[in-house]
Amino acid sequence: MAKSTAVVVTVGDREVRVSSPDRVVYEATDWAPEVTKLQVCEYFIGVGSAFMHASGDRPVALERWPGGWREGMTLSVDATGRQTGDGFYSKRLPKGAPDWLETCRVLTPNDRPIDELCLTEVAAAVWAAQMGTLTFHPWAVRKTDLDRPDELRLDLDPQPGATFTDARRVAAVARELLEELGLRGYPKTSGNRGIHIYVRIRPEWSFDDVRHAAIGLGRELERRDDSVTTAWWKEERGDASIFLDFNQNLRDRTVAGAWSLRPRPGAPVSTPMTWERLSEVEDPRAFNLHTVPEYLADGDPWADIDETAHSLDVLLRLWEELPGGELNFPPDYPKMPGEPPRVQPSKKVAEHWDERGNRIAE
């Protein structure tokens, strides 16, 4: 097949060159037509205002699939950051990027500085799409304060035996709890089987504080719904449980951004919703590149998300009052104060550990 000629798309005052516009990024499915690279770029132009409202002025990691996405492809890099799969995360702004793009200098868990793309205009997202980006992973901070998150993120992750319907039920319990605590949550589909709930907060707390707030809320959810778990090790989670991934609130940890595409069949979108609309969703695949622009034409369900920024105090009290203590951090983090041993339960020799999970000195 002959290589298609590059085209130029206009995005505000910018012109963005799109190479190989006819490349098939998503193959057709029973419920959605195929998607080309140009259509991906046009999608982000179409949802640009809502996309920027949710993720604007934030540093963002790019999940890139330069050759398009197919089932069976892998997303991976090695320990040195080199691409080893079909897709990869791009955290540093690539060399040769247009000089009009803005960056934010963020720190990794090991205090290594990285200049990441900062989403300051729709054209930046379209340029990233031209570079193969399907999913944007924005930080929970804005460029004005890179050390103080302005949102709490609740990532409800169904385990293999659980379904989207299970996640939706737990999300309703989370909504009820948040409202009891005087907090307002804004839900979205993850673009797969999960659900994300965002709570705007005042940028007055550290990443660790926000993580502890998520743990506190998760433990109260565990008390109210026995399918919810905050267990870090997979061996300790029930197969049909909903894992609240509290570590997604740490520095350099992100979830798929609102209105992002996901590398799944049918070009699904991580779609913001009202609680009422979410309660009606049976199959999140119905919200995809082809259908979301029309859905959004009825109005941005997160239009008022920035109107109120909440305090974390009520959630931090849950963290302090409910039993359980500190939980494990991700493996790329240095050992943290008070953290339990990083030993998988399946690899522990029972007599070497006390009932609190601490290694017994020999």
Which residues make up each language-model segment?
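C-terminal accessory nucleic-acid interaction domains of nucleic acid-metabolism proteins
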Residues: 1-42, 52, 56, 133-151, ...
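Active-site loop/lid in soluble adenylation, ligation, and acyl-transfer enzymes
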Residues: 2-147
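Signature for HUH/AEP ssDNA processing cores
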Residues: 117-190, 201-209, 362
